[in-house]
Amino acid sequence: MPEIDLLVREAIQNSSDASLKVDADRFDVNFTIGTFNPLKFNAELGCLKAILDKHYPEESADYLEIRDMRTTGLTGPVRLSELDREDHGNYFKLVFDTGKEQTASSSGEAGGSWGYGKSVYYRAGIGLVLFYSQIAVDDSFEERMILSLTEHETDSSSLLKEIVSDSVGRAWWGRRDDKNPKELLPITDASEIESILNIFGVGRFKQGQTGTAIIIPYINRDR
């Protein structure tokens, strides 16, 4: 199956699954291709900034946004200490569980997390994926944002290997937990979320909306 077909199928299936607990007549999934300024985005990535600036010196690059609405969004615990062993929840399963069993196959055909599953988001670009979601929490709403990088640990061109030679191919950007420095939590501050989304020219979810936006930077439109 062509990679783009797999991406569309996986995205719609994920949104369909996330719509089952929402009282609505339908759910929406929108695919949007746009451009962004690499320097502005790379500046958000700490020690990866210089490496990305070197690889992508152009003033513009392409991204893909997959956004669903009338779905539950990335619900569930955000701390390891709160996980249910039987069900990690939408947030943990998509952000942290995907890609943890890597294989030597660069085509994603060798099973594990690089098979025909959610790792398709990472394969659509260079391995960077920005997750943004708004969920219902009791009588209010909460926004969550986190960035993930997943690469093949055997890939000699890995970005992370330019920082740590024995990298296992996984990294995340979010906010540190004040209670436990070992925990990485999603960004929940509205102004910080808006600032990052502005890089891509996309907006936050409106009050009362629930759903998830997956932004994949540095895509190749010709693939």
Features from the language model and the residues they span:
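Phosphate/oxyanion-binding active-site loops and adjacent basic polyanion-contact surfaces
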Residues: 3-11, 76-79, 87-90, 181-193, ...
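GHKL-type ATPase core
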Residues: 27, 33-52, 109-223
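Generic alpha-helix signal with a bias toward terminal, lower-confidence helices
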Residues: 19, 41-45, 78
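Short helix-terminating capping/connector loops at secondary-structure junctions
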Residues: 21-26, 58-59, 207-208
